[in-house]
Amino acid sequence: MDKVGKMWNNLKYRCQNLFSHEGGSRNENVEMNPNRCPSVKEKSISLGEAAPQQESSPLRENVALQLGLSPSKTFSRRNQNCAAEIPQVVEISIEKDSDSGATPGTRLARRDSYSRHAPWGGKKKHSCSTKTQSSLDTEKKFGRTRSGLQRRERRYGVSSMQDMDSVSSRAVGSRSLRQRLQDTVGLCFPMRTYSKQSKPLFSNKRKIHLSELMLEKCPFPAGSDLAQKWHLIKQHTAPVSPHSTFFDTFDPSLVSTEDEEDRLRERRRLSIEEGVDPPPNAQIHTFEATAQVNPLYKLGPKLAPGMTEISGDGSAIPQTNCDSEEDSTTLCLQSRRQKQRQVSGDSHAHVSRQGAWKVHTQIDYIHCLVPDLLQITGNPCYWGVMDRYEAEALLEGKPEGTFLLRDSAQEDYLFSVSFRRYNRSLHARIEQWNHNFSFDAHDPCVFHSSTVTGLLEHYKDPSSCMFFEPLLTISLNRTFPFSLQYICRAVICRCTTYDGIDGLPLPSMLQDFLKEYHYKQKVRVRWLEREPVKAK
């Protein structure tokens, strides 16, 4: 009995040493009954109740199974073994202590020492009873637990139990639930991570206010990101007013090369709307118009360059009503047609309609003769007066690149080219702006020349033509000569100017004949007055 008492005291001492570092965080409930051996099912239930409260349940279950007696061994007789006085079952219900500072490595080390020095640790284990079905289930669970520990050991790359304890303590203590889920499924399905530091960057980002965009000068430091954005916004939201001085103060160095073409187009648009500077000693031809405008257009539509009559009764009448072939795509003719429809509607409406505006506009022009009229007349591809249908009949069945030069049927344009491309007969008018001829005067990036013949020479090279531009490689020569009157006009126009024709001792009818091939260049547009129409 003395030996049994010493062994019992030794067992209690070692059990206290095992769980004493947990303090009040663990609830030890040792239940001893030498006459009753509880089933393995009860022990598994007791351990299962504590498992949901712990992060590493396989490790805790393994500890509990190694601390207790083997569930497959029972002792029916008290005097068979010297350890018969020791309780066969130790039920331990462990509550997790969230504030515990002890590491799992300490518990596992003490467990190994306890198992090695236990009285039955070095003995050969015998059993007086057969294994029941419940004991088999417990062994299977124990095998699964060990296999789970091996998998975890292989996964974290540890080779010893203490290394595994350190890794598991880091995984359980310092990793959140989202991080553990990402470790589990992240290899197959990566989870998006959101940095908490990135959110304030967007919320604190500086924005350009509307009041800053209304300023004439950039309020931000030169070369900064906000300054570049300010200039970019101002460029794409340029005011429609012809008096805008935005491009005068614009710094081209702050604009990227991608926006250079847009900047040039906007400058050309303002130049077409405002006019160009007249050359020195040029005779200015002034056109004044007074128009009653529909209230839908607050400032009125733009007056077309072809409107040359002066009307004092509140409306402007176009000079002629020509039937052109491509007026639906002509900017100036669209404005003229809107004015025609508006005038026809105003003629039936009452003069004292509320909300209408009376606009006084003064447009200054200079008149210039075609500089190379003699070269054009001597060119065999020039056919003179011809409409599009006659040109299509001549070009029918011709090879790709065949073209001819003819007079344009539109009054605001002088010449047009008809050519074959893509197995069709196409037409392109030659536009003029600021004494330069091109196929698109509104786009400064399109090739332009100071003469019409120079423009034709450029587009004879197929490598210089874009897919949408005219291809003028083969000229279709005319089959008749011009009259002597046409040739003399070309020679006289080469030696004089438009205003110089008035000084020639010629009849007025002949002077008008000499002035036929000329163009008007807008040099100034002035809005004299905008006032509501007073009721009569």
Curated annotation (Swiss-Prot):
The keyword Ribosomal protein does not apply. GO terms for biological process: cell surface receptor signaling pathway via JAK-STAT; cellular response to low-density lipoprotein particle stimulus; cytokine-mediated signaling pathway; epidermal growth factor receptor signaling pathway; intracellular signal transduction; negative regulation of endothelial cell activation; negative regulation of epidermal growth factor-activated receptor activity; negative regulation of inflammatory response. Signal peptide: none annotated. Residues 471-520 form the SOCS box domain. Keywords: Growth regulation, SH2 domain, Signal transduction inhibitor, Ubl conjugation pathway. Residues 158-169 have a biased composition (Low complexity). Residues 22-59, 95-175 are annotated as: Disordered. Phosphorylated. Phosphorylation is induced by EGF. GO terms for molecular function: epidermal growth factor receptor binding; kinase inhibitor activity; receptor tyrosine kinase binding. Pfam families: SH2, SOCS, SOCS_box. GO terms for cellular component: cytoplasm. It comes from the Eukaryota. Residues 381-476 form the SH2 domain. Residues 1-50 are annotated as: Required for interaction with IL4R. Widely expressed. Expressed in TH1 but not TH2 cells. Pathway: Protein modification; protein ubiquitination. Induction: By a subset of cytokines including IL6 and LIF. Interacts with EGFR. Interacts with ELOB and ELOC; mediates EGFR ubiquitination and degradation. Interacts with IL4R; inhibits IL4 signaling. The SOCS box domain mediates the interaction with the Elongin BC complex, an adapter module in different E3 ubiquitin ligase complexes. SOCS family proteins form part of a classical negative feedback system that regulates cytokine signal transduction. May be a substrate-recognition component of a SCF-like ECS (Elongin BC-CUL2/5-SOCS-box protein) E3 ubiquitin-protein ligase complex which mediates the ubiquitination and subsequent proteasomal degradation of target proteins. Inhibits for instance EGF signaling by mediating the degradation of the EGF receptor/EGFR. Involved in the regulation of T-helper cell differentiation by inhibiting of the IL4 signaling pathway which promotes differentiation into the Th2 phenotype. This is Suppressor of cytokine signaling 5.
